[in-house]
């Protein structure tokens, strides 16, 4: 980077600093790095798309005017998103820098460069799934095949799948890695049938080394897709190729999934990801702030981690919302500001927060039982049936895993929870009185 470029930018930001509050300057301007200054073009590196958008809409004119004051020239400002630490290399080879990710063919471009093992925050809620994913990445088709990862929305399943793909490509660039959503797989199958290109479709998915399929639950009920995926699975498995699958639920709970597929999904290892605990939520927020170069007080992160418990996407979204709110209102980031910025999100989440304790209390009252009865070993119908209903509702209305639900009902096995869920689900299709009871219980739970 030239001395002239550095000196020009340092003088410019000193001018800009006098026009902004400290929080706005530190949040938006401090993270900018100059790349090049040529003719009438000034290229500036910014850490992410969100920052780029804010700079373009709110601070671009300020930068242009500061440079004009210094040089008497009006520059065209070009913000370039980059996470590279060496801006000099970016200037020389911007189009080829890929942030230490191997990009060797068409398939690898389907992987998100941000989703690596290094950027994944490990906690008690995801430690097992992370360890299993890393083991598969280190020894494809030798550790666990298939690897089936399940969990709620926004908990990191897709992140781990992309991380596996990146790790394998980094260590073996010649590997044929394919990442696809089940929806895309279905659409490609439909198009291959329509265009009479079945052979090409099968070659694409059966002559590879690694297949990563996201959201497999969406093939449920699609007979032709299940048929094709069954044969694809068999071809890869028999050729000793690695298969990684993700879903929002375990294989046994995917409705209208063919038994032959269900059994194959259970051949390898099933790993679940649960909602992050407080310590993990704090680590996620600190990692996000560090990556995005955001200056967030620790007490604000504690506030976010305390109020938002469901998933990673909402945590990170809350952080960005607070930063944007601070910038747009020219107020320092504080707990009070965070409370104001997140009031809509937090109030709506608090009204719909449902716990197993609440469900047990409502069900016990409805059936004139004690909560201890639902947790007891007694199996008389007047207790066993309400217990099954409570387990069913716990599965439907909370993010708790099957083992956790079983634990809350007297330490029962997760298979007992599955049996209860399936029994109530089946009975609901034909029992009107049960439908009425479930509706009433839902009302009472929502009123809590």
Curated annotation (Swiss-Prot):
GO cellular component: cytoplasm; plasma membrane
CDD domains reported in the protein's UniProt record: AAA, Bac_DnaA_C
Keyword hit for Cytoplasm: yes
Annotated region (Domain II), positions in chain: 73-109
Keyword terms of this UniProt record: ATP-binding, Cytoplasm, DNA replication, DNA-binding, Lipid-binding, Nucleotide-binding
Record's subcellular location: Cytoplasm
Stretch list, region Domain IV, binds dsDNA: 327-448
InterPro entries xref list: AAA+_ATPase, Chromosome_initiator_DnaA, Chromosome_initiator_DnaA-like, Chromosome_initiator_DnaA_CS, DnaA_C, DnaA_dom, DnaA_N_dom, DnaA_N_sf
Domain of life: Bacteria
Family label: Belongs to the DnaA family.
Record remark on domains: Domain I is involved in oligomerization and binding regulators, domain II is flexibile and of varying length in different bacteria, domain III forms the AAA+ region, while domain IV binds dsDNA.
Protein name, per record: Chromosomal replication initiator protein DnaA
Organism: Clostridium botulinum (strain 657 / Type Ba4)
The gene coding this protein: dnaA
